């Protein structure tokens, strides 16, 4: 029973975290979530980049490298915006995360999490107690 409860909790938490990552206003988080990258994978990529890249050997170089990457990203976004106006509107005019929509979405999210937990618990019980 405890194992079933633990598995249901872990699977439900994973679904919530992945959903939160996909609905997050951060483009970087969405890209990582859609690529299926975990935080372990991102940390490993950063470690490999720091080990093999000559620009990342020292901490001061890392700051310069991040500034260069940020500037490149900013320029790319400026140049790409006129070619894709529909994406430009989405990227620039995002809904602020602190805006309140009332209690409706919170109740719906709670009901969805509870239903997911119950469904996963049922499936685990069904396949393990045969």
Swiss-Prot record:
N-terminal signal peptide: 1-21
Subcellular location: Secreted; Host cytoplasm; Host nucleus; Membrane
Domain of life: Eukaryota
Keywords: Host cytoplasm, Host nucleus, Membrane, Secreted, Signal, Transmembrane, Transmembrane helix, Virulence
Motif RxLR-dEER, chain ranges: 32-62
Topological category with respect to the lipid bilayer: Single-pass membrane protein
Transmembrane portions of the chain: 104-124
Keyword Secreted attached: yes
Induction context: Expression is up-regulated at later stages of infection.
One Gene Ontology cellular component: host cell cytoplasm
Keyword flag Nucleotide-binding: no
Entry similarity comment: Belongs to the RxLR effector family.
UniProt comment concerning the protein's domains: The RxLR-dEER motif acts to carry the protein into the host cell cytoplasm through binding to cell surface phosphatidylinositol-3-phosphate.
Function: Effector that acts as a broad suppressor of cell death to interrupt plant immunity. Inhibits cell death induced by cell death-inducing proteins, including the PAMP elicitor INF1 from P.infestans.
UniProt protein name: Secreted RxLR effector protein 66
Taxonomic source organism: Plasmopara viticola (Downy mildew of grapevine)
Lineage, broadest ranks: Eukaryota, Sar, Stramenopiles, Oomycota, Peronosporales
Gene assigned in the entry: RxLR66
């Amino acid at each position: 029973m405890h194992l079933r409860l633990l598995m249901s909790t872990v699977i439900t938490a994973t679904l919530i975290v992945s959903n939160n990552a996909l609905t997050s206003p951060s483009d970087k988080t969405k890209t990582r979530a859609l690529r299926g990258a975990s935080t372990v994978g991102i940390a490993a990529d950063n470690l490999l980049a720091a080990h093999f890249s000559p620009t990342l050997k020292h901490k001061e170089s890392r700051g310069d490298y991040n500034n260069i990457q940020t500037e490149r990203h900013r320029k790319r976004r400026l140049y790409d915006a006129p070619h894709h106006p529909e994406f430009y509107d989405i990227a620039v005019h995002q809904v602020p995360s602190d805006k309140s929509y009332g209690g409706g979405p919170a109740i719906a999210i709670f009901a969805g999490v509870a239903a997911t937990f119950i469904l996963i618990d049922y499936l685990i019980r069904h396949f393990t107690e045969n």
